[in-house]
UniProtKB/Swiss-Prot annotation:
Pfam families: ASFV_360. This is Protein MGF 360-4L. Belongs to the asfivirus MGF 360 family. It comes from African swine fever virus (isolate Tick/South Africa/Pretoriuskop Pr4/1996). Plays a role in virus cell tropism, and may be required for efficient virus replication in macrophages.
């Protein structure tokens, strides 16, 4: 049962009763629990977003209802917890973040399952991944050591590695990351991979020390929108030749490779990097690594103008068994730059058009060269 005070707040907030307020009202609004961030609390019933002052639903600092609940629980704001649940927030998210026994009891009274802390954590993590709820996940797990410690250490890392390889997560880390950083980078990577603009902007604002890492991750995942934004709007600059190896390591990463090339990276060096990766050394022996996605990157570098006719590259290409057409093209001396890629363009939408056209004509282009040569 909700108190008259909570129900009154609900009606007043939904009707935007505090949209025009005087400075003298601030203290009263704060004491009544009607202040959120830097202004009176607001709520959009259509978007299910909690706002502050004149903030719009699309503002980077606006909160989805479940995130607002998590924040209120962490601050033990009893009336707001009740209010957010009344609007439809999932109280099970709240019990995970309760720091006091009193708040935990309140969450249970509002409908939280007390067994959730024992049996629901794993499924919650997986569900958040499926729904790409990056900011909610970070609000729940980041800096919530008591919850992170409920995960068995081995199971916790296996869970994350099962979905994404840890290469990009451990980028530039000289020692094992603490769980907080591990979780943060994991969810940040999801935001970049799926180009979730609001989470990316929110996280980049909150964690500016990860700017270089963010740019590298965007290159690795081929997110040209984020590369362009970081490089030209935020002036986060790294040497294109340092970024290119990251682009090359992600299978079929034409967007990332092209963008580094357009920024000035040496495409011959990129091809050499790929060949070294294919011929990686294990226990003193050269092990031939055959992966279609990596070979796709090799072919793309050649299409961008890399020279495939050096001794080391020749030896590797002749060992290629899966891509027969590429091997045949090499033997006939027909691996060459693709005419559509001769321009260096940096506008993301135009880059996507070029790559789309290239992918449409790539196989036809190769077969045409081979057909003409065999006549």
């Amino acid at each position: 049962m909700n108190s008259l005070q909570v129900l009154t707040k609900k009606v007043l907030i939904e009707n935007k009763a505090f949209s025009n307020y005087h400075e003298d009202d601030i203290f009263i609004l704060q004491q009544l629990g009607l202040w959120w961030h830097n202004g009176p609390i607001g709520f959009c019933k259509q978007c299910k977003m909690v706002t502050s002052g004149s903030m719009s639903c699309s503002d980077v600092d606006s909160y989805e209802l479940d995130r607002a609940l998590v924040r209120a629980v962490k601050k033990n704001q009893t009336d707001l917890i009740k209010l957010f649940v009344l609007w439809g927030a999932n109280i099970n998210y709240g019990i995970i973040c309760a720091k006091t026994e009193r708040t935990k009891v309140l969450c249970i009274q509002l409908g939280a399952d007390p067994k959730f802390l024992d049996v629901g954590l794993y499924n919650l993590f997986v569900d958040l991944i499926k729904q790409q709820k990056v900011l909610l996940a970070i609000d729940i797990y980041y800096d919530n050591i008591s919850i992170l410690d409920r995960f068995d250490s081995h199971d916790f890392y296996v869970l994350i590695d099962f979905i994404y390889n840890c290469f990009i997560l451990n980028l530039d880390e000289k020692e094992k990351m603490i769980k907080n950083t591990y979780v943060l980078k994991f969810w940040f990577k999801i935001a970049i991979e799926f180009n979730l603009i609001k989470p990316i902007r929110f996280l980049s604002k909150k964690f500016p020390h990860l700017d270089d890492w963010r740019l590298k991750t965007a290159v690795y995942l081929g997110n040209v929108d984020e590369i362009h934004h970081a490089y030209f709007q935020e002036n986060i600059r790294l040497d294109p030749n340092d970024m290119m190896p990251l682009a090359c390591m992600y299978p079929q990463n034409k967007l990332g490779i092209y963008y580094c090339f357009a920024l000035g990276a040496n495409i011959n060096t990129a091809l050499e990097t790929l060949i070294r990766y294919i011929n990686h050394e294990v226990n003193g022996e050269i092990t031939f690594f055959s992966n279609y996605g990596i070979w796709s990157n090799v072919h793309f570098c050649i299409s961008l103008g890399a020279n495939p006719y050096t001794k080391k590259i020749q030896e590797t290409l002749l060992r290629q068994e899966k891509n027969v057409i590429m091997k045949l093209l090499f033997r006939k001396g027909l691996l060459s730059p693709h005419s559509i890629l001769h321009k260096k363009i940096l506008e993301p939408s135009e880059v996507r058009k070029i790559i789309s056209t290239y992918e449409y004509t790539e196989t036809f282009h190769s077969f045409s060269l081979l057909r003409d040569n065999l006549r």
